[in-house]
Amino acid sequence: ITRENLKQFDGIFFYTTGMLLPDGDPREALMDFIKAGKGFVGTHSAADTFKKYQGYVSMINGSFAGHPWGGGSTNGFLNHEPNHPTVAMLGKEFIWKDEIYQYNNFDPNAVRVLFSLDMAKSKPQMPYHVPVCWVRNFGKGRVFFTNLGHNGSTWDNETYHKHLIEGFKWSLKLTDGPAEPNPELQAKESIKAFALFASQKMKLDHDKLLKDMMTKAGDEKFIKLLRENSWKSKGRDMNLIKAVLTELK
């Protein structure tokens, strides 16, 4: 990748891993390419690429932090934007067999999450929200990322082909679809994951807990605590879970 070579392209696709490019201008050239109005599409391990280069991590908005949902697992997904061209082919809810990442360095205020794990239909169940596909504006450019793409069966699936092709088209500005961040939706998804986990582990009334927690969906301090503690707990440290519940009293 060089600045001169990039001039011939309108977009770039990453299904990659590792550091790829040397320090300095090649990396900056890639970021400037997108910011200038070009398209970026990343699948699966694109979020396990350039993990030590903050410019890329910030652009894609996440870095690999494990995959509790391995390639042999079949999980449920919630499509939050069924009218968005990049995910319209998937329906409001769907089941898929693939390896699903969880992420460090994910900023809910930076991206529009299009679909997420449905913890009620996934194993293991974790107390935190796991985004799977998102879009964003990056400078004048567009970024589309989907975590799907580990399994060969995914690449053989015609629905996935449509998903990816529409991602390319959207990133190249050939179709329209919103990219404004949706942190409010993500906060509610965080609450839903936590309430499901806590009610099962601590034998609480799920519906009441969910209702009580939803009253605090707009409380930034509470949502920050919820996200931090649920992530740090890894579904094991119940003291961190209890600390969140204490804030409801």
Feature locations, PLM:
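Structural detector of well-ordered beta-strand residues that form the stable sheet scaffold
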Residues: 39-41, 114, 144
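Extracellular ligand-binding/catalytic regions of CAZymes and related secreted enzymes
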Residues: 121-130, 137-209, 215, 223-224
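Catalytic beta-strand/loop cores that center a nucleophilic Ser/Cys/Thr
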Residues: 62, 67-140
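Alpha-helical adaptor scaffolds
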Residues: 225-248
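A glycine-rich, often tryptophan-bearing local segment used as a flexible ligand/cofactor-contacting loop or short
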Residues: 14, 19-89
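Solvent-exposed, acidic/flexible segments
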Residues: 19-27, 157, 161, 234-238
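Short acidic/histidine-rich motifs immediately flanking catalytic phosphotransfer sites
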Residues: 5-12
